[in-house]
């Protein structure tokens, strides 16, 4: 969504990369805790983050690759996000399910 917003606002390829870097920096780590009202809130947060990531990138502001999980380019960053999702979140998912089962 964020890159689509950037495209509609005339973002260059370099700015599209910045959008990806900004989104990864802002949202990576958000966890799914089951289908519930929290999902709607997470959708709102992600939408807000998309608009902010685009606004920053269009001003050539970007969280660089030396910070957090960001890589030297968008592809590296997305690869890092994939590693966090699997295998990185396997135990987290099990823990969330255990918490939900105990309710």
Task: Label each region the model flagged.
Residues 3-103:
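Functionally critical mobile loop/hinge segments
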